[in-house]
Amino acid sequence: FQIFSLGHGSVASEIKGRRNTNRPKTLIKITEGGAKFKSYIDGKVFMLTPEESIRIQRLLGADFIVVLDECTPFHVDKKYTKKSMDMSHRWALRSLTEWKDHDNGSQKLYGIVQGGVYEDLRDESADFINNNDFYGIAVGGSLGASKNQMHDVVSSTMAKLRKDRPVHLLGIGGISDIFHGVTCGIDTFDCVHPTRLARHGGALVKPGFYETKNEPVS
């Protein structure tokens, strides 16, 4: 659960430098308690806390789950990024406590490395996640305004992470990004890219992209 799409747009849009001003604004306010947002369906207001985030993911039955965090857009300044990172660290500890209180061994919790595009903040966040009792580590937060910057952030972050935990790259899954991530030591990825292509009649095959929507169905 990243408090990002509620207010800032998608990670893909950020990497491409797009800002969709026509999207309904569902995020109302982020506080120490959690994120208050409005349903785009009926306008009902909800409060998503770190504890509620873990409870929801537990009920979903996911094999690995993540702490609640705020994923800041790349264009915010370092002061805001630091403030957000510190709050996300506190949320991570609350998420960890909630998970431990109900852990039955069927799910694993990942902490999320924050810090945006600022290397010293990334180092600080990596130390925090390394030194707390998470099963795995997710590389999250803003990864930059371009693919090259994203690759640089991932590379420098991976160099700081402990080697005895699995590492997941949040929201990134382009073909070149996967190859780069694996080279850096990333174990798993998640991305809408394959299913988005499929919805539009495409598929990922060697050596690249294949258009299927005009092909006869057998």
Feature-to-residue mapping (PLM):
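Glycine-rich phosphate/ribose-binding loops and adjacent secondary-structure elements
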Residues: 86-89, 102-218
